[in-house]
């Protein structure tokens, strides 16, 4: 039985509402791209349609969330947190020397509102794709929509500050967002005392984990739940380095309730460590990659809704329920048993060395449990 005062979080990986997805929403941006191979964002829509079928244009704002929207409502989530990996801007000032640039038109912010997203993590390798003007417009747009954000700001102090999310009758959740160069974040995107940018994570040593854990605790009050959202690691591959696991373990041992990792285009390992949750790579949640070949074995079309129930008094995990989804036609769809089983087997394979197992329920949801007691 879950305690009445427990806090249920929804966490997911990269939400990439720019480029192709932006083109099918009611207010598409100028489709001009500055990529080596594709110069028009509408080409990504055509690629997706070539393998998945017709995608509606001028789609309703809630279209992309598909079956995930009803699942969120059913789960009675207290706080909805995403990694927003797209600027929200009409800026034309694209970052020179960068191969890929993501942006969503500001008038399409209603697609984020439609899913009742509470908090956007911004410290990633696409939030400054359209320059400092693009970042400033992104922040203004989120503020105007009353959506909390963390990880980017007008200076280093603002970028490092948490999103403070008050949950009446339950307490507070502090969400911190960090971007690592291992995910492709340019060093020059680091915010400084006199320059806008992101909350830059220079390395993933235990020493740095100790330092930033202290910084996070300095913002907290008694019984606050602290989430460290980290954009780190390569796009493809399951291997975790000793430094990555050591970094995550150090954060947990210093009182962080959840390590929310993302950047990989596919689901990676999850771990329950000291009765707290580590998500090493949540995988892309929404993107426009349909029709792009080369990494099919990773099944990046399958993703997970991570529903973590936390005891705010101890910061410990009470339940980790994962709901599989399949991305098709730029929309999140429920999966069948075979796809749910594939994800469950993957999590067991990756979690076994970490002392974490996955159990598949008849409704195709997956529960994480510690195998170490």
Go through the PLM ranges and name each one.
Residues 1-373:
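Acidic, metal/ion-coordinating pockets
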